[in-house]
C-alpha cells in the first residue's frame, strides 16, 4: 500500500451495468397479480419487443417480503448452450 500512496486494489472490480450481472425490468412489477394469463401476456409482449433478450420471471412473497422463485421464461433463438 505504501508504494502507491493510497489504498490500492490490484484485482478488484465493481460490477457494471453492461457486464451481464444486472437485468433491466420490463414495465412496473405486477403487484397483487394472481392471474397467470396476465403474466404470460406480459412475457409475450416483452418477447415481441425484445426478441433477442432473455426473459426472467421473479416471484416475491408479499408477506415475508422475500424472493421465492426466479427462472428464465424465454431464451432467444440466437442463444446456443455450449
UniProtKB/Swiss-Prot annotation:
The protein, known as: Ribulose bisphosphate carboxylase small subunit, chloroplastic
Misc. remarks from the entry: The basic functional RuBisCO is composed of a large chain homodimer in a 'head-to-tail' conformation. In form I RuBisCO this homodimer is arranged in a barrel-like tetramer with the small subunits forming a tetrameric 'cap' on each end of the 'barrel'.
Organism in which the protein naturally occurs: Sinapis alba
Gene name of this polypeptide: RBCS
PANTHER family recorded: RIBULOSE BISPHOSPHATE CARBOXYLASE SMALL CHAIN 1, CHLOROPLASTIC, RIBULOSE BISPHOSPHATE CARBOXYLASE SMALL SUBUNIT 1A, CHLOROPLASTIC-RELATED
UniProt-listed SMART domains: RuBisCO_small (SM00961)
Main location: plastid
Cysteine-cysteine disulfides: none
Keywords for this protein: Calvin cycle, Carbon dioxide fixation, Chloroplast, Photorespiration, Photosynthesis, Plastid
GO cellular component: chloroplast
Function (record text): RuBisCO catalyzes two reactions: the carboxylation of D-ribulose 1,5-bisphosphate, the primary event in carbon dioxide fixation, as well as the oxidative fragmentation of the pentose substrate. Both reactions occur simultaneously and in competition at the same active site. Although the small subunit is not catalytic it is essential for maximal activity.
Location(s), subcellular: Plastid, Chloroplast
Record-stated family: Belongs to the RuBisCO small chain family.
BP GO annotations: photorespiration; reductive pentose-phosphate cycle
InterPro entries per UniProt: RuBisCO_ssu, RuBisCO_ssu_dom, RuBisCO_ssu_sf
Keyword Nucleotide-binding assigned: no
The protein's assembly and partners: Heterohexadecamer of 8 large and 8 small subunits.
Amino acid at each position: 500500500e505504501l508504494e502507491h500512496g493510497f489504498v490500492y486494489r490490484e484485482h478488484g472490480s465493481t460490477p457494471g451495468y453492461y457486464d451481464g450481472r444486472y437485468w433491466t425490468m420490463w414495465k412496473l412489477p405486477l403487484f397483487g397479480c394472481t392471474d397467470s394469463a396476465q403474466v404470460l401476456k406480459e412475457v409475450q409482449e416483452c418477447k415481441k419487443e425484445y426478441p433477442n433478450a432473455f426473459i426472467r420471471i421473479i416471484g416475491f412473497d408479499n408477506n415475508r417480503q422475500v424472493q421465492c422463485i426466479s427462472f428464465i421464461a424465454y431464451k432467444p433463438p440466437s442463444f446456443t448452450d455450449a
